[in-house]
Amino acid sequence: GQGERQSATASGQPAGKVMGASGAPGGVQLIRLPNLGASDDTRADENNDSPRGKLLLDGSNVSRAVQDVRRSLGTDLTDRWELDDDANRGRFLLRPYKPMYISFMDWTTSLNGTPGTPNPLNTTDAGNASLANQGRRAETTFQISFKSKVAENLFGDNGDLWVGYTQRSMWQIYTQQLSRPFRETNYEPEVMAVFRTNYRLGGWHGRLASVSLNHHSNGRSLPLSRSWNRIIFQAGLERERWTLLLRPWWRIPENAKDDDNPDISNFYGRGEAVAIYRHGGHEWALTVRHSLRLNPSRGSVGLEHAFPISSYLKAHINLFHGYGASLIDYNHRQTRIGIGVSLTQWL
């Protein structure tokens, strides 16, 4: 079969197509909802023209209803990554990627006053302390993140090519005596090949698999330069209101002399898992990174909560503990708490 991207109703209409309802009141329309993750029994019902999957709705609410039902079926990944025809919006348009937020107050238990690495060229000390992280433990942090699809159906009716960009900045806005500098900014462009999947694993539905080439750097000169390149593999699974992203990666080796941070994998990690739960307009996201080594065992844990405060804006609270809050702090352990607003979330 052609998979979910090619799903259609038994009547020959594309999934989700709006059809007129004979005898229905003015403005009321009959729609058939997308056949997502349906069992064989469900498909049989549809072929027998069962009312399952049909709703009578006011025309102005059709789009919202389709979106709500898709989410209740566990299709957030399908919508965010445009994995079927109903979700497909075409190429060369900006789409949300990772959360976009601003934490007006982001407080840390410990500033990294003399950041360093095993490479002596990338280490600060008393002799160049003016180059080190300075300022207050409270700052403003914001992140922008977007992606765009540049090619579709690389392998038959599956496989899309995306480009993405994420930028996270830490702004010492409360440090007036230092002219409110940006303490750290991390840049993360990447190219991603994303494939639709359809399998079951312990009650979870595997929706996507991807592989990406990722560059991550802070754009600074020695001794504060930090950077690395990775190949990131990703599996995306869903279960009702839950979404799980499993993201192991492999660091592309560098020449030892030019390596800004040769031990970054032992602190920042060799992979991460992101568990997302959505309900009633709220979204909780738990991110766990780990070095995948037992001695020593290092990594981080982060928790985000976003909830509505207006029609288009959500409050955003985030907690972080461990290593890698930023690249300059990849080997500095700290606890952070941030409070602000978000425009987009993981899903």
Residue spans for each PLM region:
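Detector for outer-membrane/organellar transmembrane beta-barrel domains
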Residues: 216-291
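Transmembrane beta-strand segments that form the barrel wall of outer-membrane beta-barrel proteins
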Residues: 127-131, 167-169, 209-219, 244-252, ...
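Residue-level signature of outer-membrane beta-barrel architecture
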Residues: 148-150, 193-197, 215, 237-239, ...
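Residue-level detector of the transmembrane beta-barrel scaffold of outer-membrane proteins
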Residues: 93-108, 160-164, 210-212, 243-247, ...
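Outer-membrane beta-barrel initiation region
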Residues: 5-178, 185-189
